[in-house]
């Protein structure tokens, strides 16, 4: 008789399972005999130990495995018969009341996958982003590269300005008491690079070598130094040196320093434009994809299995702890990481994954081999030996599958854009590149 699966609430289901004690014991005895052929028991030759002795040493473990196997088989038969897709693993609870002596009974509580309905794509409002790359962006990037290669020349009597390198001594106190990290001598930094807190840089602006200043500085509440975060310190700084940054000319020597072997400035600019366009394209794709995925999630109204959300949360917590270890954070395994910090994003990821999977199936989308190859070749252009990178990905099925997943996601985005209400939006270059 097929077990009856009971609907509890939402995606939760329950089913009663039963296995025969006789069937359990029959399988236990069979496995004990198999183990007995090779088991080494003190005082007996291999294969000659009495079954009763094997029962004492191996019986409990074998019986546990057999019961798990038979109950698992009964569960699979029950959900297959009900044509259900189980999300996660069931929770098994032994039953004792009203159960025959020759039967082991359990209640399995579990979740099922939801019926996912892909929203009407024509009703979705999404944004497609664009950023033109002109000579202005190329020249702006050239200026950044020049500043990175600036040579600093000491200027006597110069009041410090943005872009200057200053060398100074500083000492800070909180309530009159020095604190760790609050004092340094001959400390160099470039004004305007954002290396120091804004109030600190502002205090150093306009000072000449030999001049000092006393000023208050409030540390941000989220400052990395927890012992001073949110507190106000009093700093004294004394400037010892002001050096002006002298930018290199954009000439053959400069081009060669950036890897343009021939020293051709125009070819350098062309290379810079190509690199900018590649980076801009990747960032625009990311923004547009974000708009598409946000629209899908917003329109996808269905319950998601808690088991899948919990699994995603566990994975993200494990990844976060691993990142802390890589950064050398002590006791990373004991750092508090409440599940609720991750649960909202995990639920979104699970919902989006179910939606995208159903959309791929309905629209019969796939990552075509030529698309995968093109994406690998495009990705390889970021490396000095692109041909080796292409071979690296094509030679390994798992690595190739990573690119296939990216291409398939791109095809999902393209499919939605073909069918949705699309608004085109220009993004300023500085904003796109995080320079604004």
From Swiss-Prot:
Organism superkingdom: Bacteria
Subcellular compartments: Cytoplasm
One GO molecular-function entry: protein folding chaperone
Any one Gene Ontology BP term: protein unfolding
InterPro entries on file: PPIase_dom_sf, PPIase_FKBP_dom, Trig_fac, Trigger_fac_C, Trigger_fac_C_sf, Trigger_fac_ribosome-bd_bac, Trigger_fac_ribosome-bd_sf, Trigger_fact/SurA_dom_sf
Major site of localization recorded for this protein: cytoplasm
Pfam families xref list: FKBP_C, Trigger_C, Trigger_N
Broad class of enzyme this protein falls into: isomerase
Reaction(s) the record says it catalyses: [protein]-peptidylproline (omega=180) = [protein]-peptidylproline (omega=0)
All copies of domain PPIase FKBP-type, residue ranges: 163-248
Known role: Involved in protein export. Acts as a chaperone by maintaining the newly synthesized protein in an open conformation. Functions as a peptidyl-prolyl cis-trans isomerase.
HAMAP family tied to this protein: Trigger_factor_Tig (MF_00303)
Domain notes: Consists of 3 domains; the N-terminus binds the ribosome, the middle domain has PPIase activity, while the C-terminus has intrinsic chaperone activity on its own.
Family statement drawn from the similarity comment of this UniProt entry: Belongs to the FKBP-type PPIase family. Tig subfamily.
Protein name listed in UniProt: Trigger factor
Protein species of origin: Bordetella pertussis (strain Tohama I / ATCC BAA-589 / NCTC 13251)
């Amino acid at each position: 008789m097929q077990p009856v699966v009971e609907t509890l609430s939402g995606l939760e289901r329950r089913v009663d399972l039963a296995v025969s004690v006789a069937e359990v014991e029959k399988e236990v005895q069979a496995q004990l005999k198999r183990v007995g052929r090779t088991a080494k028991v003190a005082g007996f030759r291999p294969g000659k130990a009495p079954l009763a002795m094997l029962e004492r040493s191996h019986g409990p473990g074998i019986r546990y495995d057999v019961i798990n196997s038979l109950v698992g088989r009964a569960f699979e038969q029950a959900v297959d018969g009900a044509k259900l897709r189980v999300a996660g693993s069931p929770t098994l609870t032994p039953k004792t009341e009203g159960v025959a002596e020759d039967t082991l009974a359990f209640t399995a509580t579990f979740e099922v996958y939801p019926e996912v309905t892909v929203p009407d794509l024509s009703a979705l409002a999404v944004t497609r982003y664009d950023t033109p790359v002109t000579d202005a962006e190329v020249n702006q990037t050239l200026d950044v590269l020049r500043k990175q290669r600036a040579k600093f020349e000491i200027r006597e009597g110069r009041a410090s300005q943005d872009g200057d390198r200053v060398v100074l001594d500083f000492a800070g106190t909180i309530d009159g008491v020095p604190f760790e990290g609050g004092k340094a001598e001959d400390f160099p930094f470039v004004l305007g690079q954002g290396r120091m807190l804004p109030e600190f840089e502002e205090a150093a602006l306009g000072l000449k070598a030999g001049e000092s200043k006393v000023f208050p500085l409030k540390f941000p509440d989220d400052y990395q130094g927890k012992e001073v975060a949110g507190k106000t310190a009093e700093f004294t700084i004394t400037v010892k040196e002001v050096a002006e940054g002298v930018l290199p000319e954009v000439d053959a020597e400069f081009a060669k320093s950036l890897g343009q072997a021939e020293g051709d400035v125009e070819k350098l600019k062309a290379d810079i434009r190509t690199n900018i366009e590649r980076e801009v394209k990747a960032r625009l794709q990311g923004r547009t994809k974000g708009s598409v995925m946000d629209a899908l999630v917003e329109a996808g109204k269905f319950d998601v299995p808690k088991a899948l959300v919990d699994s995603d949360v566990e994975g993200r917590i494990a990844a976060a702890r691993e990142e802390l270890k890589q950064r050398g954070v002590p006791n990373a395994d004991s750092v508090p990481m409440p599940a609720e910090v991750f649960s909202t994003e995990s639920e979104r990821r699970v919902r989006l994954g179910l939606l995208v999977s159903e959309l791929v199936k309905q629209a019969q989308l796939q990552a075509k081999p030529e698309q995968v190859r093109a994406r690998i070749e495009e990705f390889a252009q970021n490396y000095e030996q692109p041909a080796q990178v292409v071979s690296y990905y094509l030679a390994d099925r798992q690595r190739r599958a990573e690119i296939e997943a990216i291409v398939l996601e791109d095809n999902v985005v393209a499919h939605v854009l073909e069918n949705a209400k699309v608004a085109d939006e220009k993004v300023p270059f500085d904003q796109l590149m995080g320079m604004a």
